[in-house]
């Protein structure tokens, strides 16, 4: 202050308070200095965090997620990628190699430049599959859907299974290049929980197909969804097939032929009155065999847990997510359950889907895979790090999922050497972290408070699934008996 005389114009009480405050600012106590330093550091952290959030939000993977519906971004060729430098204020650890990095790739926000370039190239990898046939389970949405698309675009014929075949057919028909591969796609309704139907399906494929080159055991249950989650799909799935447009009916012709074959077989009764099916399996008291094939969509409405009574309060009508799946507003789901909280029914059906069905498919489809010996056949069992015994960061949650994936890993490790003798190369693949399985409330909180988003998307997951097939055909060196994580062998 140049003229301290001005203080004389200030009331004495105010003047004393002002001088006292000025003195504390110029000569703070040690505690006040510490508090000020902490406040400044916190403000700087918030500023840097805000800058980094903005930088990460500019990557393609995040901009794609910001859209209401997921659409896989087109490939950006070398030389066409954005040239502006994206550099974080605070270093991060690479999702893949764990190295510290600051510079961001134009597409990925959680990888160092080297790993990002490698993963981006693998994301768009392909191989000539013309004339070959692949079976992909769980091919209606997410990784299974993208896997089927990759195989179709590589020239393969694809048999896709799902509990909701008409919804799947509609999704495929909306792809911009649908006309290029629609004649090579066949969609079958199949509920993998009903293991007699799985075996019936393998026998139908063996009798109706000349070859099978690739088996992708992708279908899996991680979070169990109550009947209300699927209720909106039933109207279409149960309507007369004639209501569907010709392009949808064409995709379902093979499924309808399978169901018709089962019906013919069921009409032939055994002497004891049980219904007989085309595969020699009798179902007591059944009107026909293979309910997992004939009524795959309706089986989703079986209720056996308390939350099966939940309705529109947690599954709001007309609300879907980026994968066009029903929004699930439950406060707790399977991903957060401990051992004592998992129902016996859920544990059993999860084992049927995640490990028993792949066992049946691998074993019963071997003759079909050997019908056209090429020494280039592949089985990919889609697994996860949750099934790895070498993983030291497991929590006490979802033990039933962990044990199912561990069983699938052991199936692969045990049988891969045997199948390799016949030119069938079996591997397990971890798809990587592509989605947040936590309940919607927790996922939203992590996104808002921590700016957390999974480091990969469903196309990255599909690329990892297809890699043993594509890499084997491109290089001529076919791997087997390996658990792949991020395209590289990982400990079991």
Model-found features: residue ranges?
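Rossmann-fold cofactor-recognition segment
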Residues: 176-196, 277-294, 299-305, 310, ...
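C-terminal helical subdomain
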Residues: 257-315, 445-492
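Active-site-adjacent segment of SDR/Rossmann-fold oxidoreductases
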Residues: 209, 414-424
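Active-site helix of classical SDR
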Residues: 362, 404
């Amino acid at each position: 202050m140049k003229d301290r005389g001005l203080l004389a114009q200030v009331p004495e009480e105010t003047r004393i308070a002002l001088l006292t405050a000025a003195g504390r600012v110029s000569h703070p106590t040690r505690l006040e200095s510490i508090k000020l330093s902490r406040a400044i550091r916190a403000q700087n952290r918030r500023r840097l965090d805000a800058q980094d959030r903005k930088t990460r939000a500019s990557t393609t993977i995040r901009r794609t997620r910001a859209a209401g519906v997921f659409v896989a971004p087109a490939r950006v060729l070398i030389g066409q990628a954005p040239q502006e430098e994206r550099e974080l204020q605070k270093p991060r650890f690479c999702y893949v190699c764990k190295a510290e990095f600051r510079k961001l790739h134009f597409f990925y926000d959680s990888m160092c430049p080297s790993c990002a370039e490698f993963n981006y190239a693998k994301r768009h990898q392909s191989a000539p599959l013309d004339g070959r046939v692949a079976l992909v389970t769980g091919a209606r949405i997410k990784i299974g859907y993208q896997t089927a698309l990759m195989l179709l675009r590589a020239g393969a014929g694809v048999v896709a299974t799902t509990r909701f075949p008409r919804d799947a057919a509609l999704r495929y028909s909306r792809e911009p290049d649908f006309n290029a591969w629609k004649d090579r796609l066949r969609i079958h309704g199949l509920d993998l929980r009903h293991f007699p139907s799985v075996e019936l399906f393998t026998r139908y494929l063996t009798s109706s197909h000349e070859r099978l080159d690739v088996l992708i055991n992708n279908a899996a249950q991680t979070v169990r969804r109550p009947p209300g989650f699927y209720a909106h799909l039933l109207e279409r799935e149960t309507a007369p097939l004639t209501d569907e447009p010709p392009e949808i009916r064409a995709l379902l012709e093979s499924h309808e032929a399978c169901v018709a074959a089962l019906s013919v077989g069921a009409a032939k009764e055994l002497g004891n009155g049980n219904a007989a099916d085309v595969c020699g399996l009798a179902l007591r008291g059944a009107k026909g065999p293979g309910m997992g094939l004939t009524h795959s969509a309706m089986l989703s409405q079986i209720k056996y847990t308390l939350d099966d009574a939940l309705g529109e309060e947690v599954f709001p009508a007309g609300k879907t997510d980026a994968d066009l799946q029903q929004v699930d507003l439950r406060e707790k789901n399977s991903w957060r359950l401990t051992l004592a909280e998992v129902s016996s029914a859920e544990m059993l059906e999860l084992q049927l889907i995640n490990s028993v069905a792949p066992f049946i498919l691998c074993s019963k489809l071997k003759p079909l895979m050997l019908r056209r010996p090429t020494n280039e056949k592949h089985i990919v069992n889609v697994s996860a790090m949750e099934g790895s015994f070498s993983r030291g960061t497991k929590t006490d949650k979802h033990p039933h999922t962990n044990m199912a994936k561990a069983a699938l890993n052991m199936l692969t490790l045990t049988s891969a050497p045997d199948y390799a003798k016949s030119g069938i190369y079996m591997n397990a693949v971890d798809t990587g972290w592509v989605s947040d399985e936590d309940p919607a409330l927790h996922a939203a909180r992590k996104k808002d408070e921590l700016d957390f988003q999974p480091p990969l998307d469903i196309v990255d997951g599909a690329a990892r699934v297809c890699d043993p097939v594509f890499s084997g055909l491109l290089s001529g060196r076919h791997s087997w008996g390996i658990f792949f994580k991020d395209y590289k062998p990982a400990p079991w």
